[in-house]
Curated annotation (Swiss-Prot):
Organism in which the protein naturally occurs: Shewanella pealeana (strain ATCC 700345 / ANG-SQ1)
UniProt-annotated binding residues for ATP: 148-155
Gene3D superfamilies the UniProt entry points to: 2.40.10.170, Bovine Mitochondrial F1-atpase, Atp Synthase Beta Chain, Chain D, domain 3, P-loop containing nucleotide triphosphate hydrolases
A Pfam family assignment: ATP-synt_ab
Domain of life: Bacteria
UniProt protein name: ATP synthase subunit beta
Reaction(s) catalysed (UniProt annotation): ATP + H2O + 4 H(+)(in) = ADP + phosphate + 5 H(+)(out)
Assembly description: F-type ATPases have 2 components, CF(1) - the catalytic core - and CF(0) - the membrane proton channel. CF(1) has five subunits: alpha(3), beta(3), gamma(1), delta(1), epsilon(1). CF(0) has three main subunits: a(1), b(2) and c(9-12). The alpha and beta chains form an alternating ring which encloses part of the gamma chain. CF(1) is attached to CF(0) by a central stalk formed by the gamma and epsilon chains, while a peripheral stalk is formed by the delta and b chains.
GO MF, one annotated term: ATP binding
Disulfide partners: none
GO cellular component, one term: proton-transporting ATP synthase complex
Length: 458
């Protein structure tokens, strides 16, 4: 193990000089023992100098400090010892519950599985959330993105998915908190503890207040832990909140390293960095990784390079809309914007496909009629269009659902709706079975039977 000295410190960027015959490789982990700080090599500048990014605060660093080369990239603990624990980007425990006691350590920079090793089976994963199961069904071993601007419910939706899937699925989960609020990480821990699934979840956090190096690598740390479970033949759920912060950390690091920015100030390597992470999130013939990723959409603009680059890697996209949230309909999923590769008659079956298509057709027609209604009023519509509008409004209301994780602030008990009940309910509305019921009866209920019961009470 060679040693070098710090020659320059500019924020999170630290330049280290090594003997010419012992220059570290790119991605090698270096350690400043006196400060307990790990650095990751990003560039070799020549003359024995390497440019690194600090995986922690660089406050108090000075020139001349001794740096030791570990000879390998950052390694993190993997395996069952990580379950129920909160770790940082280096796999160190931050939950004050003692050492991890790991059985094994993996490097965080690994190759994606080869195409031959990947699995291509399609099995649906029921979430219990009506709008998602109907219009953008998830596949086991697939990748799902939750897209939305600030404050439309990405984290709440993700928490509900974790609550529903992790409980019903009884598999293992890894949660990577990338550049999000510390409070959310704390809430998540207690949520898992209350649900009794804490011993099945490994948590890795790199919060908003941490240096860009941590936020850039914490997703890889979580993914490495998930890969270990997958390679042991288990089905793993991998949650990332928020993938946009991963991109943002890459932008910060890129600027610190002096690279020329590209469109909207993002790093020129945006597509490649996203690809490196996403290509590793895949299912093999041994086990599966089902990934759910929250994606912040800057200024609600889905064409922004960051969300646009993420779109390409996903099997299903759940788009959360501010307009729907403003109507008080939660989850604020836009059924016309959300998509899934699984919504195919050969995968979900003809009935499910026809009902989902019917719902989207009715909602699209209602959207077109809104302008006419605003100018001329409902009376100018044909009887057929009036029926479409009434059914569309019922569908809109019925797409709302009380969440288990939101019970505290809504006061309504959460509801899990099976796929069979979801299809039956929407099919009934489309066929006019419930035309006699008031639309308010469909708001914030679980199955269609509850809507009927609610209407009869009134």
């Amino acid at each position: 193990m060679s040693t070098g000295t710090v020659v320059q410190v500019i924020g999170a960027v630290v330049d280290v000089e090594f003997p010419h015959d012992a220059v570290p490789q790119v991605y090698d982990a270096l350690e400043i023992k006196s400060e307990g700080l790990v650095l990751e090599v990003q560039q070799q500048l020549g003359g024995g100098v390497v440019r690194t990014i600090a995986m922690g605060s660089s406050d108090g660093l000075r020139r001349g400090l001794e740096v030791v080369n570990s000879g390998s990239p950052i390694t993190v603990p993997v395996g069952s010892a990580t379950l129920g624990r909160i770790m940082n980007v280096l796999g160190e425990p931050v939950d004050e519950a003692g050492p991890i006691g790991e059985e094994d350590r993996y490097v965080i920079h690994r190759e994606a599985p080869s195409y031959e090793d990947q699995s291509n089976t399609t099995e649906l994963l029921e979430t219990g959330i009506k709008v998602i199961d109907l219009v953008c069904p998830f596949a086991k071993g697939g990748k799902v993105g939750l897209f939305g601007g600030a404050g439309v419910g990405k984290t709440v939706n993700m928490m509900e998915l974790i609550n529903n899937i992790a409980k019903a699925h009884s598999g293992l989960s890894v949660f990577a908190g990338v550049g999000e609020r510390t409070r959310e990480g704390n809430d998540f821990y207690y949520e898992m503890e209350d649900s009794g699934v804490l011993d099945k979840v490994a948590m890795v956090y790199g919060q908003m207040n941490e240096p860009p190096g941590n936020r850039l690598r914490v997703a890889l740390t979580g993914l490495t832990m998930a890969e270990k479970f997958r390679d042991e033949g288990k089905d793993v759920l991998f949650f990332v909140d928020n993938i946009y912060r991963y991109t943002l950390a890459g932008t910060e690091v890129s600027a610190l390293l002096g690279r020329m920015p590209s469109a909207v100030g993002y790093q020129p390597t945006l597509a490649e960095e996203m690809g490196v992470l996403q290509e590793r999130i895949t299912s093999t013939k041994t086990g599966s990784i089902t990934s759910v990723q929250a994606v912040y959409v800057p200024a609600d603009d889905l064409t922004d390079p960051s969300p646009a680059t993420t779109f390409a890697h996903l099997d299903a996209t759940v788009v959360l809309s501010r307009n729907i949230a403003s109507l008080g309909i939660y989850p604020a999923v836009d059924p016309l914007d959300s998509t899934s590769r699984q919504l195919d008659p050969q995968v979900v079956g003809q009935e499910h496909y026809d009902v989902a298509n019917g719902v989207q057709t009715v909602l699209q027609r209602y959207k077109e009629l809104k302008d006419i209604i605003a100018i001329l009023g409902m009376d100018e519509l044909s009887d057929e269009d009036k029926t479409t509008v009434f059914r569309a409004r019922k569908i809109e209301k019925y797409l709302s659902q009380p969440f288990f994780v939101a019970e505290v602030f809504t006061g309504s008990p959460g509801k899990y709706v099976s796929l069979k009940d979801t299809i039956r309910g929407f099919k009934g509305i489309l066929e006019g079975e419930f035309d006699h019921l008031p639309e308010q009866a469909f708001y914030m209920v679980g199955s269609i039977d509850e809507a009927v019961e609610k209407a009869n009470k009134k």
